[in-house]
Amino acid sequence: MTSPSPAFGVLLVNLGTPDEPTPKAVKRFLKQFLSDPRVVDLSPWLWQPILQGIILNTRPKKVAKLYQSVWTEQGSPLMVISQCQAQKLATDLSATFNQTIPVELGMSYGNPSIESGFAKLKAQGAERIVVLPLYPQYSCSTVASVFDAVAHYLTRVRDIPELRFNKQYFAHEAYIAALAHSVKRHWKTHGQAEKLILSFHGIPLRYATEGDPYPEQCRTTAKLLAQALGLTDGQWQVCFQSRFGKEEWLTPYADELLADLPRQGVKSVDVICPAFATDCLETLEEISIGAKETFLHAGGEAYHFIPCLNDDELHIELLRLLVQEQTQSWISAE
């Protein structure tokens, strides 16, 4: 007797990580990442010689050292935490729906791939799949890239599954509540700094002027979080991190802001990265280590990084709610 097929399956998607903190593995990862036209939309005739001839011959060794500074005995922080998220969400969903609901990971770049995630869900009998990109704010460089990868996979499938695709959740009540809880928990332990800095991953300014809603959604998230925390306008500020290349990106830049704040008389900051659902190189190294050094070197006295939501209970609850909202029509029709 075969087991009944699950009501649906869930594919949790994040950006990805190198398999190892080595130049070879990082080069392989960067090649795939930076070859995505959603990430770098320059003409391949212009971009690929730069990527293949310069970037992939200079950056992997440097970036590998950065990964080594945050790598754990269990592996990449992003991968370890993502696995915990998937396991806890599967447990939560299975209890909610009173049956086994499979949850698999799929990374836009690196392993496990989005294709392998679909294959695992199919092997478990899932004919309906919710694709849940772990990007609260929509951007063409992240969420649309996931959509492209899903669509590309489906072009090679004879019998495609029924799909639900969660585009964004930047203003979801449960998301704002989870962020607010993480900040309040931090304040309870460490006290409240003079200013809360909300650092979002940046994108080229051109993407925004061409219609990407990402910066507006980031500012909406920030405003809602500040309201939930009861902060005045002078107690919080938005910035954008991780810029790459010579093109102008969204401003203010995180490193420049944190270097300037002590000169404005701000001596203590708490920094949170709301656009990241999972701690990774950009939060654990760039913000928790590098940005801290920038702030303290400029004359700051106290710098605290507030971790991402990761596998916190309220975050898993949020993910469950997002899945329930996407599957409402499926369940009600049965």
Curated annotation (Swiss-Prot):
NCBIfam families: hemH
A GO cellular-component term linked to this record: cytoplasm
Functional summary from the UniProt entry: Catalyzes the ferrous insertion into protoporphyrin IX.
Binding site for Fe cation: 201, 282
Entry's EC annotation: 4.98.1.1
GO BP terms: heme biosynthetic process
Enzyme class: lyase
One of the record's GO molecular function terms: ferrochelatase activity
Keyword entries, A-Z: Cytoplasm, Heme biosynthesis, Iron, Lyase, Metal-binding, Porphyrin biosynthesis
Record pathway: Porphyrin-containing compound metabolism; protoheme biosynthesis; protoheme from protoporphyrin-IX: step 1/1
Cell wall biogenesis/degradation found in the keyword field: no
Domain of life: Bacteria
One Pfam assignment: Ferrochelatase
Identification of the protein by name: Ferrochelatase 1
Annotated organism of origin: Shewanella oneidensis (strain ATCC 700550 / JCM 31522 / CIP 106686 / LMG 19005 / NCIMB 14063 / MR-1)
Record has Metal-binding as a keyword: yes
Gene that encodes the chain: hemH1
Family the UniProt entry places it in: Belongs to the ferrochelatase family.
Catalytic activity: heme b + 2 H(+) = protoporphyrin IX + Fe(2+)
Subcellular location: Cytoplasm
